[in-house]
């Protein structure tokens, strides 16, 4: 009888900030599979301007995970989010508990 190890893939959201812009991104097995970019608008706001998920990863919840991480980041820093990205805006529209950071 053959035994197979079950492979567990983790989709942890990471944050990268460079000067006045940044990105939340997800790596799977060392490869970036999704990214959501933002820019700082002054000291108290960030503008989410783009969300992208690599082909084959659509529908896995990566986009919502990144928006959720952005909301946590905004709450920790006491800042607001302006979701210009249509995907991010749709998540905010569907998730009333995120609206405190708008």
Map each language-model feature to its residues.
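A conserved beta-strand-loop-helix scaffold within acyl/acetyltransferase catalytic domains
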Residues: 36-44
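Conserved acetyl-CoA binding element of GNAT-fold acetyltransferases
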Residues: 45-54
């Amino acid at each position: 009888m053959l035994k197979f190890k079950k492979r567990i893939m983790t989709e942890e959201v990471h944050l990268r900030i460079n000067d006045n812009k940044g990105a939340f991104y997800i790596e799977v097995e060392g490869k970036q599979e999704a990214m959501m970019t933002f820019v700082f608008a002054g000291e108290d706001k960030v503008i989410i301007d783009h969300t992208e998920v690599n082909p084959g990863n659509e529908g896995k919840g990566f986009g919502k995970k990144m928006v959720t991480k952005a909301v946590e980041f905004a709450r920790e820093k006491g800042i607001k989010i302006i979701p210009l990205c249509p995907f991010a805006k749709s998540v905010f529209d569907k998730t009333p508990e995120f609206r405190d950071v708008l």
